[in-house]
Amino acid sequence: QDSTNIGWVFWPAIQAAPCFIHKKLTGENVPALIPAAIDQDPYWRVTRDIAQKLGYYKPAQIHCRFLPGLGSGGKMSASLPETSIFTMDQPDAVKKKIWNAFTGGKGTAAEQRKEGADPDVCSIFQYYFFLFEEDTAKLVERERKCRGGEMLCGECKKDIAEKLNVFLGQHQERREKAKDI
């Protein structure tokens, strides 16, 4: 078939727009620093290749880590809604997704108490790391308890589901109020 999806052409332009918008709005050419996840790197490489030819500075990039999906690996994806938390998810849906999330835990509570778990592969632990535990000492302690079998996955899942629902509830309220602005 000799056709292609318009997204192949359109999406790189959308991704590149933040690099050039300042000059378009103000006439001032300033360097751009763009935070993006590693999967966006191909777009920035193309942008860097063409920027100077268009009269702009080459944009710099900062690669950010993904907030992983709730499955056994990879990023959240709208095409896998059961592995993603959406800003408009309702509390019951969030709780169900979190309770079904992949963790670094063992098959049984007894086995996990004996052998510990692996927070490095745990999607729930990543929520503490990225969003819900600002105190490094507390995060390190949670990791130690996890690895040592002192803390079970169910405890973390219950806590994260509650924290997410509070966070999302506040977001949804603000979103509704913003509609009136």
What do these predicted ranges mean?
Residues 1-64:
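Divalent-metal (Mg2+/Mn2+/Ca2+)-assisted nucleotide/phosphate chemistry catalytic cores
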